[in-house]
């Protein structure tokens, strides 16, 4: 089929397999160009490995550290009428490139919140790897099916206490709007913590630990975002922030457990990037377009791959073998460049000035749009989007 982008809301409903493969190849080449990560992990499980920071983590481990990787994700292959999800094509490409270099790569397509996912991962680790020395937890899901009861719990992207009104960008019409979001109820806050908090990360690590498949000195990391006062009402001070604070709670509990055998658990606070997850959060697209422009001007811009490589090489797996620098909550801070005072002051000054007319001039808005489309395999140089492509891409994946 000939595949063109179709946008609905903040999701692109079509994906381009050749474009997705090109994206993955670009991240692999970037990793190789940066060089090998000394003291890097060798057997890595990535929960939520098909896009964004999870995919970059799998690439950093495999191509930066020659690690065997096992990826867990929930994606859809193509059907007769429509292409598969971007994460499906991303993983197919990763698997192809990893195997071409003789690297172990296995993937499980399933609900990562389920008991079955954990059982299958443990089984594969026991059979093929013995143990893992790193577990990356990078799930971004709006819904969690509770593994025991089967109840579906939904998260909310809402403020707490009062209605949040702010300048935002309508990414469909490319115009500046005022957006208002009603505050979350107590139940919605609790549900958001259930879906996006640290409980499932704990369930994964405890299951792996009980099964004896975590090596001594095993490191685990889960990803978070804190941001600044520009996004705090909807994010850190909102329902989602409560969930991310629960991730901090889980990190401390897991760290106490793993430290007994020389291991560690940390939350890594990452910078804002264009992902399917961030595009769904009100005000984030506008903030990202602003902050990207300033960071590019200052030579500080990083994409997912740059961030994760820096986390591996300068935090978790330092050449000198020293423990990573953390903040007072034992978090790894990779948002340090974004939070620089001059960068943030620039955004604070700019925010009230943005109009539909000057949007592309004051912020990297067209670059934001291009990055967004790229997530789905579109707008990549050298690809003929009028060519007929086969959407049916298969690879070595276990379906649960």
Swiss-Prot record:
Binding locations of substrate: 225
Enzyme Commission number(s) from the entry: 1.3.1.9
Gene Ontology biological process terms, A to Z: fatty acid biosynthetic process
Keywords, ordered alphabetically: Fatty acid biosynthesis, Fatty acid metabolism, Lipid biosynthesis, Lipid metabolism, NAD, Oxidoreductase
Active site: 235
InterPro entries with a match to the protein in the record: Eno_Rdtase_FAD-bd_dom (IPR024906), Enoyl-CoA_Rdtase_cat_dom (IPR024910), FabV-like_NADH_b (IPR050048), Trans-2-enoyl-CoA_reductase (IPR010758)
A single GO molecular function term of this UniProt record: NAD binding
Pathway in which the depicted protein is active: Lipid metabolism; fatty acid biosynthesis
Pfam families, sorted: Eno-Rase_FAD_bd, Eno-Rase_NADH_b, Enoyl_reductase
Domain of life: Bacteria
Binding site for NAD(+): 48-53, 74-75, 111-112, 139-140, 244, 273-275
Site (Plays an important role in discriminating NADH against NADPH): 75
Catalytic activity: a 2,3-saturated acyl-[ACP] + NAD(+) = a (2E)-enoyl-[ACP] + NADH + H(+)
The keyword Coiled coil is assigned to this record: no
Family of the protein in this entry: Belongs to the TER reductase family.
Cited PANTHER family: ENOYL-[ACYL-CARRIER-PROTEIN] REDUCTASE [NADH]
Family annotation (HAMAP family): FabV_reductase
NCBIfam families cross-referenced by the UniProt entry: EnoyACPredFabV (NF043048), PRK13656.1 (NF010177)
Subunit structure: Monomer.
Protein task: Involved in the final reduction of the elongation cycle of fatty acid synthesis (FAS II). Catalyzes the reduction of a carbon-carbon double bond in an enoyl moiety that is covalently linked to an acyl carrier protein (ACP).
Designated name of the protein: Enoyl-[acyl-carrier-protein] reductase [NADH]
Lineage: Bacteria, Pseudomonadati, Pseudomonadota, Gammaproteobacteria, Alteromonadales
């Amino acid at each position: 089929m000939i595949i063109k982008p179709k946008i609905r809301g903040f999701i692109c409903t079509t994906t381009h397999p050749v474009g997705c493969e090109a994206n993955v190849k670009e991240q692999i080449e970037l990793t190789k160009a940066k060089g090998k990560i000394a003291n890097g992990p060798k057997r890595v499980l990535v929960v939520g490995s098909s896009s964004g920071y999870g995919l970059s983590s799998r690439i950093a481990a495999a191509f930066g550290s020659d690690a065997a990787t096992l990826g867990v994700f929930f994606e859809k292959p193509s059907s007769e009428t429509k292409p598969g999800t971007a994460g499906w094509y991303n993983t197919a490409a990763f698997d192809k490139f990893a195997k071409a270099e003789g690297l172990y790569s296995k993937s499980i397509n399933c609900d990562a919140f389920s008991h079955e996912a954990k059982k299958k991962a443990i089984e594969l680790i026991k059979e093929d790897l013995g143990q893992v020395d790193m577990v990356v937890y990078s799930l971004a899901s709006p819904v969690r099916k509770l593994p025991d009861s089967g109840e579906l719990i939904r998260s909310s992207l809402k403020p707490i206490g009062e209605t949040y009104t702010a300048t935002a960008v309508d990414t469909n019409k490319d115009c500046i709007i005022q957006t208002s979001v009603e505050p979350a109820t107590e139940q919605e806050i609790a549900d958001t913590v259930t879906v996006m908090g640290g409980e499932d990360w704990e369930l994964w690590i405890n299951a792996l630990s009980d099964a004896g498949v975590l090596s001594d000195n095993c490191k685990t990391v889960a990803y978070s975002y804190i941001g600044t006062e520009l996004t705090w009402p909807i994010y850190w001070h909102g329902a989602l922030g409560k969930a991310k604070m629960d991730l901090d709670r889980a990190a401390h509990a897991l760290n106490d457990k793993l430290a007994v055998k020389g291991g560690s658990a940390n939350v890594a606070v990452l910078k804002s990037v264009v992902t399917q997850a961030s595009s769904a959060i009100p005000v984030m697209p506008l903030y990202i377009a602003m902050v990207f422009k300033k960071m590019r001007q200052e030579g500080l811009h990083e994409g997912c791959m740059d961030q994760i490589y820096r986390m591996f090489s300068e935090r978790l797996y330092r050449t000198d073998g020293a423990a990573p620098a953390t903040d007072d909550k034992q978090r790894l801070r990779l948002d340090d460049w974004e939070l620089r005072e001059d960068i943030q002051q620039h955004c604070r000054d700019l925010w009230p000035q943005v109009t539909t007319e000057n949007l592309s001039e004051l912020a990297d808005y067209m670059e934001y749009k291009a990055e967004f489309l790229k997530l789905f395999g579109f707008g990549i140089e050298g690809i003929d989007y009028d060519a007929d492509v086969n959407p049916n891409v298969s690879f070595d994946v276990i379906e649960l």
